[in-house]
Amino acid sequence: MSIAERLIELKLIKHNLKTIINGLGGRCGENFTLYHTDLEKLITERDTGNEYFTNFNISDNITKIGDYAFPNAKFSSINVPSSVKSIGERAFFNNRSLTSVTISEGVKQIGSDAFNSCSNLEQINLPQSLEYIGWGAFNNCRKLPRITLPTNIKEIGSYTFANNRTFTNFEFPSMVTRIGDSAFSNCRKLGNITLPDNLTYIGREAFAYNQVMTEVTIPDTVTTLGNGVFAYCMNLEKVTFPEHAIINLTDGTFKFCTKLREVNLPNGITTISYIMFQNCANLTSITIPDTVISMSSNAFMNCTKLNDIQLSQNLTSIGNSVFYGCTALSSITLPNSVQTLGDSTFRECTNLQNITIPEGVTKLENNLFFNCKSLTEVTLPLTLVTMGLNIFLGDTLLTNITIPKNVTTIGNSCFQECGSLTSITLPESLKQLGSSCFNGCVKLQSCNIPSQVTRIEPATFYRCKSLTSITIPDSVNYIGNSAFDGCTKLQNANIPNSVTRLEDRIFNNCVSLTNITIPNTVTFIGQYTFGGCNNITELIIPEGVETISQGVVHACQKLEKIVIPHSVKEILGQGIFYGHPKLTDVIYNGTKEEWKKIKKATNWWTQSGLAVIKCTDGDFPLRNYLTTEA
């Protein structure tokens, strides 16, 4: 049944009907007037034909415009009479032809999203009788240049004026106590505002993404600023708080306010919240009030001009990445109250020169001073027990450091690429030294390994080109891959009897190493273990070794003699004796028949120039030593 047919039927309805509700629509043509001398209420179901309405009048008998009454219609103007007391949710949603609205005195309520996405609305007057505006009521009304709220309004709901592109100013009624989430979010041209004196709450991202606002003053009545209230306000330069305000500043309050240069934090706050000032690239200085006891993760991350910060004297905790990327920060004084420093706290602070970690701190978290390229001096507390991963990685100007006497663990890559580090003394308390700990410390000349350490992890001293000697204690039972690889000045090194395997490349390219003794506890020798050790003249492999891997003595230019034990069961890889121009003696402590039974890779001796293997019962000839053995 069409709307026109329904209207005929509705003439018979009793005279006490007064409401338009739920999607009045249909295909009634371009002109439609809702009035009748006997009709006071029209009830319809939601329809899809509202896009056909272009002109619409509401008679003085109507008291309510219901939810979803005219979504997607094409009205150019609307006059709401004084008889109407409320306008329902989404009543005129997405009416893109609507340019003006007149709402008469008497209307008390505008529902949520009532005019949402009326993208060409340019003029609307709100009556003083209005007491409530629902969330999103004028969201996406992009061309609305101004609006005056009646004095009775106490709350501006979430998204009420969001995404307006023409607002330049806004006056708040004095009775407003709450501004909801994203209420003015993405109002890009909204200038400086005066917040009302009775305001207590500003919701999440209420003014986020504003491109014009340069300063704002927070009233002393405000107790909560929601997450990201002023986030991405790219031109905001100054924020003023009441000195003694009791206020909850939540996550991301000023994140990406790239021109923010001045903010006074109130004495009532206790926490600097997560990403509060992240990417505030023009913030140069800030004082953290003494009421603050903690700073959450990423609070000042990438504040690239921050060079002066005064911390709370009651601060106990600094979270992860708080000062990550603060490239202008050259010094900072940590109060004695600090007990914890989070992961990456000072990472990429490339101008930080010196710092003292207060007593009471027991652990340095991962990446704490990662790539602090100007750091020359660090004082560590006696209370320190654990040092995490990558703490000083890339700190190229750090020349020396004292590790406190109670430290038991130093994590992976802790001092990697500390290119100026010349010496370090490790405490006897140390039990664990992480992999790549001193990798790339090209000026490190000496380092002790304490007696409680049981493992030298892979690449621990990789490319320590100035290291001349190392004493490995008997407690060590494992030496990992490339542990001393590239230590070109290493002349002396010992392998304790507790070691059973020599992993790949342990002493690879140790060109100054003249001799090495392998203990008889070793059963396995990995690939290129002594590769490129140009000053070794002989290598005696002890009884007990069962596996010799590829390239064990690869390119040892001065090598003349190798002794292979009777215990060997397999020789892995091709060209095991390749690159030894002076090698003349390969002695096997077994018979020719036993030698022949050893498992070998195809062409294991190719390009070596070797003619025979000297066995206990005579020489084993290599008939064609370029291709196959006898």
Question: Predicted segment positions?
Answer:
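Surface-exposed receptor/substrate recognition regions of extracellular proteins
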Residues: 1-55, 64, 585
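Generic detector of short, aliphatic-rich beta-strand segments that form the cores of beta-sheets
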Residues: 36-46, 610-617, 624-626
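Intrinsic-disorder/low-complexity loop/linker signature
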Residues: 40, 252, 553, 617-619
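Structural signature of tandem-repeat unit edges
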Residues: 51-64, 73-86, 96-109, 119-132, ...
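Consensus positions within tandem repeat domains that build extended binding/scaffold surfaces
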Residues: 66-69, 88-91, 111-116, 134-139, ...
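Short, aromatic/basic amphipathic alpha-helical patches
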Residues: 575, 597-607
